[in-house]
Amino acid sequence: MSEAMVFSKIDEYTLFMSRSLQKSLKTFAEQVMALIYQYKDTLVEDRLALTNTLDEAVQILVDSGKEEADKLGFNIYSAVSRYISEIWASQSGQTTAAPPATDIDGLHRQLVALKNSLGQNAELYEQRCQLQAELRELQEFSENPAAAVEEIMQLKAQIDELKYGASNHNALVQEKRDLERHLADLRLSRQDTNSRLPQEIDRLRAEIEDEKRNLPHMDDLQRQRDELQRQLDTIRRRGNTSGVMAEIENIQRQIDDANSSASSEHELRMLRAEVETLRAQKSIVTRLEAENADLRRELQDIRGRAQEMSASQRYSANQAQELQEKAMQAEELLQQKIELRRQLHEALERADAGEAALRDKRRLEDEIKGLQLRLTENDFTKERSILRNEIQAKTTEIDTLISDRRALETKLLNKEAEVDQLLYEKQLLKTELNSYRGTNEDIDKLTFEKRQLVEELNDLREKTIKYDQLAREKAALETELKENSYNFDQLLEQKQQMRSDLNALREKAADYERVDRELRLKDKELEEKNAEIERLLEDRRVMRTELLHSKESATDVDSLIQEKRLRDRELAHLRDRMSEYERVVEERIQKEKENNLLKQRITELEQQQRTATVRETEMSALREKANELDGYNRERQAREHEINMLRDKALESDKLRQDNRVMAMELTELREKVQLLEKLQYEKRARDVEMLELRHKAMDVDTLVEEKQRLEMRLAELKIKVNNYDQLADDKARLQEQLKEMSDKLIEFEMIMDDNRRLKLQVKELDLKTANMEKLYEEYKKLEDQLKATKAMTSTGMGVSAASPAFYKTKSMRLTQQNNQMKNTTDNLLTRDIPKLIDKLIERPAGTTTMGRSGKF
């Protein structure tokens, strides 16, 4: 590889770097535009975040450029190293001496310096492009900042309106769907409860009729009692004791059946029938005195059986008490069922109240939607558009005023030049006045120029007044815009409050659903309890049959007691027993009457207690309903208050619109008045000018000069005021400083390019020196060959003749000295002179290494 190829590689590297820089700058510009578009909304609010992201993008771009530069530098280094290796290979064919390592190190250093300089150039070029882009942005922003900010605010407002409209629409659609679903669920639950209630009522009525049907009728019991009495009379008339026992057993079984199925009144009637039978037995006692002895033995047996019968009666009384307890439990279950039914009815009434509340809620929502539509119609969009148009007009007027001010500045500069000329002319006039007194024409000319200056000063003053007035109007309009946006934010907060109220209503509806589910569960529990009641009734029937069987087993004892009573012939004992029995019967009848009265009293008290509990539950339900109605009324009043507030706000918005219109009319009137004032001021100014002309014609040149100085002072004050109004001069100075910095960086860049050119020239010189070194090396080889030849000749000459040893000795010494000098010169070139030359060419500062930024070299 030749040096031309090496330099072509370097040129390709520089071209590639320039192209890659152009591409990277293009991509960087695209990234910057994308970032600006992405952060368009937050350009004013979060400018720091935008600048940070831009800095990160620039850093990534610079790093990628460095990596590409390192890759290309490595390729160039490999090409140069191949070139050097080829050179040394070509030289190694002529000599076996290895090349010194110092040459390669020097080339390494040279290449590293070249690559560093190119990397610095690329970085400087990137920084220059970045600074130019920032400078361009700042110039655009400084030329028209109000338009950029206004455009950004308009886009942000449009995006916010679109987002708000989309969210509002989605929320309303979702709320509508939720309300429709909830209403459908309520209707289904109400249909289920309405279809279930008549079924439950019919089932309960059927159960009551079955119970009534199972109970024995009073007529049947009376008929059975008459038949038993008639059979007993026939048996007594017959007097057959053998057949009497069987018939008595049958009658006793029938009596037991009747007693088991009859109530306490039937038992009293049966006891009275037994008393009548005992009285009838008194007539039979006279006929049974003969059988008294036999009956005594039987009497003892009867006493034992009587004891057994009393024990069985106690057992039957315990069973009856258990049955009464079970009946009480059944009555309690029925009371619980009635209470649950009542709660179900209350829940249905609450559901009706909830439906009424939902209807009122829908009505309120319709009113709110109407108000929202009215508010969206009155959404201050028109006012905002009007205000924005007015602000834009004001900004245009301000821009025109700024342009006028710049024009006035130019005019002022011109006037300053004219004033300088006037001063110069004044000096000339003074010289002429010294020579001869001035004429009236010069005085008229000066007065005319003075009048023009006064008019220009008045125009400047009026324009500054207009500028201040427009700035105040702009500030007032901006405050109005902020107030309107604040009112709109308040409306949004009220809407959020209404949404929270809707969520509360939804939670109440969920509570109603939960109550409905609980009532359904309680209905299931009632059904289970009804099944338990039926099971208890079945157990009662079974126990009733068992009692009948037990009473059938006790009929033998009763028959023996009757036989004992019939056969007892002892009148005294029988009378005593009969009297005692009658007394016991009367006491029992009285106790039964008292028990019946107590039972009636207990039933009445229980009924009163039940009615009281029902009334208490009804009162509690009514209280709950009253509380719910109060809460609903409070919510309704709050809603109505909110609606009234919204209506008031709508009226206030209408008033604000009307006020805006009135203000616009007032503005037009004020503008007309300002125009009239301008006309009056113009006329007054004309009159003042005429008066000043009349006065100045009578003045001397010195007074004109003094007035001119005063006007100059006024011009200087106006300049100071103009500089205070605008700060563009500071921006201009800052931009000029940036331009100076950029120009300095460009100068540095040009210096670096000059250094690169100088390095290329130094590389060429180094190549020339390497060529000279090759020539010297060839001469050195030739001298070595000559030395070898002379040595050979001396060796042959020594063998031929030894006549002149001193001659040969001096010649050989001369040749050795020449060879030593050549060796020293070549060694000095290879070891000292060439590295010094390379270091001098590279001009590497002390402390630097041959490694690059990436650490590859």
From Swiss-Prot:
Principal place of residence: cytoplasm
GO-annotated molecular function: structural constituent of cytoskeleton
GO BP: microtubule cytoskeleton organization
Record keywords, A-Z: Coiled coil, Cytoplasm, Cytoskeleton, Microtubule
Coiled-coil parts of chain: 169-546, 571-793
Keyword Membrane in annotation: no
Mitochondrion recorded as keyword: no
Gene Ontology CC: one annotated term: ventral disc overlap zone
Location in the cell: Cytoplasm, Cytoskeleton
Function: Structural component of the ventral disk involved in maintanance of a domed conformation of the disk required for proper attachment. May have a role in immobilizing the microtubules between cell divisions.
UniProt comment concerning the protein's domains: Shows an alpha-helical coiled coil structure (30 repeating heptads).
Protein name listed in UniProt: Median body protein
Organism encoding this protein: Giardia intestinalis (strain ATCC 50803 / WB clone C6) (Giardia lamblia)
Lineage: Eukaryota, Metamonada, Diplomonadida, Hexamitidae, Giardiinae
